[in-house]
Amino acid sequence: MAAMRAHARRRHPHALMSRAAGLPRLSWFAGLTWFAGGSTGAGCAAHPALAGLTAGARCPAYAAISASTARPAATALPAVAASTARPAATAGTTPATGASGSARPTDAAGMADLARPGVVATHAVRTLGTTGSRAIGLCPSQPLDCPRSPQATLNLGSMGRSLDGPQWRRARVRLCGRWWRRSNTTRGASPRPPSTCRGDNVSMIELEVHQADVTKLELDAITNAANTRLRHAGGVAAAIARAGGPELQRESTEKAPIGLGEAVETTAGDMPARYVIHAATMELGGPTSGEIITAATAATLRKADELGCRSLALVAFGTGVGGFPLDDAARLMVGAVRRHRPGSLQRVVFAVHGDAAERAFSAAIQAGEDTARR
């Protein structure tokens, strides 16, 4: 065993996880190593600190995958599998699947091997592309759930964007000391496409501007520019309270007061939306500021994700009773949406009144797109 460890250190130094990368020290066989040149190697060991990506076992509560940055990226690398009781798999083969790619049952001896700590897993783990980084680890508090999966696919094509199996739930992936959050997806579903405007780790939010009555929009949630006491007495707030009925104001009173820049939800009452998210943009009758508008927008987006909303209508915060300049409010709100890393949220509609408001928000969206392209 000592000789094998020494050989691994000489041959595959990148398989060792260092504390400098923010990961705990693991044994040499805890990592999955791969080669772009078509050769095979040992990989994916069932270490006591890890649960192997194998049939009959849950996906790891903490999996470490190391990849060499010196190798060129590949669209589909050969399967890597090895066992202390079986010869290593030939490059391009997949021991856990048949010729058609369908799952093949595992024999009892193989299952017994997988249950023993320290024995190299017999099932293939395929890597697609490269992360351009040394290591990736799964947060131990959010394990993936892949019961009885004969083959798991680690898609490392875009900085650890996805780690998929037949069944999985939300997970967080640690990459080079930073947290990247997976989209909130139902079991068995495929992740949504990555964003092209704010980074590969988040999903795209469609931005729209409409001159519309926010109380008539059939979306998951609409927003209300409220005061900290949630008394909906004037402007858009009064229109929302009238359209929602007495239940909306009753719920608001129960949840009041809230702090400036905070957001709470109530039911939408008689309106077609499911929720109303009330964001406190000012004190009762008082002015607002750019910092409050930015904080209120961010809090509204987070609340929409917490509620599992896919679509959200935003009104122009602070531009009515608050007296904040329309162009500045549009720029701040669009910027907050672009910085937001969504969970369930896919569509944001800016519901505005008048041509001036429509031009302001449309210009803010266009300016953000021009900046992203540069």
UniProtKB/Swiss-Prot annotation:
Renumbered residue ranges of the record's region Disordered: 86-109
PROSITE patterns found in the cross-reference section: MACRO (PS51154)
Biased composition (Low complexity): 86-104
Transmembrane portions of the chain: none
Domain Macro: 179-354
PANTHER family named in the record: GANGLIOSIDE INDUCED DIFFERENTIATION ASSOCIATED PROTEIN 2-RELATED, MACRO DOMAIN-CONTAINING PROTEIN
Protein name: Uncharacterized protein MT1950
Source organism of this protein record: Mycobacterium tuberculosis (strain CDC 1551 / Oshkosh)
